Amino acid sequence: MENKIIEIFIPGPAGRLEAKYFKSKKNTSPVALVLQPHPQYGGTMNNKVVVETFNTFKENDFSVCRVNFRGVGKSDGEFDNGQGELADAAAALDWIERENFDNSQCWVAGFSFGSLISMQLLMRRPEINRF
């Protein structure tokens, strides 16, 4: 079966989170979470930098997820000044780790506001190996 990028909805603290997901064929592949720029300035998971980062992880055989924060696209909720978005990122990381429990490494990446949230997540989650 060919691996494809699929649309998923991850249960989040403010409702469901719209995401795109690619699962590597290797069970022990590294995982990556890619986060969007600032939602109040038009940032979405479809931002060019986010998509290119996602594709780079995919091409390097990662299982990778990019997610729209609360209130963006088809995600439920509304902007929460970074606190809620950090909780959204944690929920997305929990989801990708459950889907890939044998992962060899855990990476987070983001663009602009997404980098800020990634860094905050990194400080709270010891399983994250790379930023």
Predicted segments — roles?
Residues I10, R16-F101:
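Serine-hydrolase catalytic machinery in alpha/beta-hydrolase-like enzymes
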Residues M1-I8:
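A domain-start/cap signature at the N-terminus of enzymes
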Residues A89-F131:
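Primarily recognizes the serine-hydrolase "nucleophile elbow" in alpha/beta-hydrolase
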